[in-house]
Amino acid sequence: MLDALDEHDYLISTTGLISREVFAQGDRTRNFYMLGSMGLASALALGVALLRPNARVVVLEGDGSAMMALGTLPLVAAERPANLTHVVLDNEAYESTGAQPSISDRVDLGSIGEASGYMRVNRVSSVDGMTAALPAGSPAGPALVVAKVVLDPLLRVPPRVSLTPQQIKARFQAALAENTVAVNEA
């Protein structure tokens, strides 16, 4: 999924293992790693999308994080940021805190996105499906991608993000201050 990002895209990733994996896969100044703030990634992404309407903004969070702040989904839909793609990695667990089961096996997050008013909702369960759901450029959003995933228990746990929250904030603010490329120019 990270390969689908353009150098001008902003990525906000939720706390825990998702931010750790994003950081390990390739740190960028336009990545904002939420450290210790579960459930707030989508709200931050909405703010970035509204601030920078000509840049694609992707938020990456788990099912536990998304369910902690379900009220953000209708807020995102009401604001209608065409440049926002909201990706939920749904493994039906709070993986970062010990893999306790979540309730997403009984809650259809895609249907909640549709009922909230997201312009596009995709449900995927493969890498090919994820690639198709994240097209180059950014068709009218907001878009929600709910990806059912299964974690391999033998995979290594990525190292912690080595930046301090202050460093993450400062460099992301600097990236926001840079000129951005329009979504459809890429």
Predicted regions and their residues:
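Long, charge-dense
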Residues: 89-99
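General beta-strand structural signal in soluble alpha/beta enzymes
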Residues: 10-15, 33-36, 59, 122-125, ...
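Conserved thiamine diphosphate
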Residues: 100-134
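Glycine-rich beta-alpha junction loops
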Residues: 15-18, 91-93, 148-153
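Glycine/aspartate-rich loop-and-adjacent alpha/beta segment that forms the canonical ThDP
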Residues: 139-186
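Active-site pocket-lining segments that scaffold enzyme catalytic pockets across diverse folds
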Residues: 1-7
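Thiamine diphosphate
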Residues: 21-91
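Acidic-glycine-rich active-site phosphate/pyrophosphate-binding loop
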Residues: 8-28
